[in-house]
């Protein structure tokens, strides 16, 4: 069975994990109510999408 020959150092381990991270959500301002919302989705506060009301609040 394969076993590591040397212990992985903290620096090597951390260099490997530099790309192991979460991305922040892509928030944009709603043109109707100026609240933050996810792009390409209906605004949860006013219900508008692409300039028209999709969900009545």
UniProtKB/Swiss-Prot annotation:
One of its GO terms (molecular function) is structural constituent of ribosome. Keywords: Ribonucleoprotein, Ribosomal protein. GO terms for biological process: translation. SUPFAM superfamilies: Zn-binding ribosomal proteins (SSF57829). InterPro entries: Ribosomal_bL32 (IPR002677), Ribosomal_bL32_bact (IPR044957), Ribosomal_zn-bd (IPR011332). One of its GO terms (cellular component) is large ribosomal subunit. HAMAP family: Ribosomal_bL32. NCBIfam families: rpmF_bact. Belongs to the bacterial ribosomal protein bL32 family. This is Large ribosomal subunit protein bL32. It comes from Halothermothrix orenii (strain H 168 / OCM 544 / DSM 9562).
